[in-house]
Amino acid sequence: MRRAGGEGGPVLVLPGNHDLNRSDAARFEGDAVIPVESVSAADFRRIYAPFGYDEAWSADDHSLSYVYRLCDGLRILFVDCNSDAGSDTIPSETFPWIESQLLEAQAAGERVIAVSHQTVLQHNSRFADGFVITNRDRLLRLYRQYHVAVNLSGHMHIQHVRQEGSFTEIVTGALSVLDCPCGVLRLTGEGGEYTARSAVSAELQAEATAFFRANAFHQGMAGGDEEMAGYLADLNAAYFSGRMDLAERNAALLRRWREADAFTVSYIESLLEDLGRDFTKASFSF
């Protein structure tokens, strides 16, 4: 993280759902898995103090949420919903602080970009519990009231974009998956343009893609034959990389999956809802 920060911009963090209060926290030595003490919210703030918290414009007293003023005219609002293990919920006491920060930014004539780990919008029709912030409706009302145009999230490990009215949410793909993407966000006074691109060499990208497809193929073989598993692997690769414009609907293989495994075909159909879409690019207006 310090090396990344040395490239010329700040590195800013927010806890994810695996970072705090974990009963299964462990370290690894060779093949051994050794239980260790988990990280608390206070530990997280101390460990990552140089990565946002030390220079926070404002910090919430009830969570690890904070505001970072990136430059004149732009603030980044980090909303924490993981201070309680597995909660996926913003503490109710945090909402007055969020509104006060949005009101202050509005009064100063400054734009706000929001960030969360779990998503504010539902990006897949099958997956809500554990993926979407449980009290997101209250947060969305504030974002609409104070004209927050975009939220950057993660958690799902897919590259995806969802828009509801004037609000856009970009789920940024995980570096550990498939194309190993990073997102580039270019801002103007009127809005922003987002592009996902691989952060690794073409050789490593090909290796990561092959590894991902092999795992997806193995999972598919648990319920189908090689042709069915290959189709599932292709769809998963397209979905996680955000390139559903490269996927296709195969009626014959869908029929075979429907006969073999109701859960898998339901999952496949949820992916195909985004058929034809390229989620590696997005734009929004302030």
Give residue spans per PLM region.
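Active-site-proximal loop/helix segment associated with metal-binding centers of metalloenzymes
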Residues: 37-48, 95, 104-106, 110-123, ...
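Acidic/histidine-rich helix-loop elements
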Residues: 29-32, 55, 85-90, 124-127, ...
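Catalytic metal-binding/acid-base residues of hydrolase active sites
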Residues: 17-20, 82, 119, 155-159, ...
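His/acidic metal-ligating clusters that form di-metal
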Residues: 9-10, 69, 75-77, 85-168, ...
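Short, electropositive alpha-helical surface patch
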Residues: 2, 25-44, 129-137, 164-176
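A short C-terminal boundary segment appended to hydrolase-like catalytic domains
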Residues: 189-286
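Short, surface-exposed coil-to-beta transition loops
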Residues: 178-182
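Extended active-site neighborhood of metal-dependent phosphoesterases/phosphodiesterases
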Residues: 1-96, 184
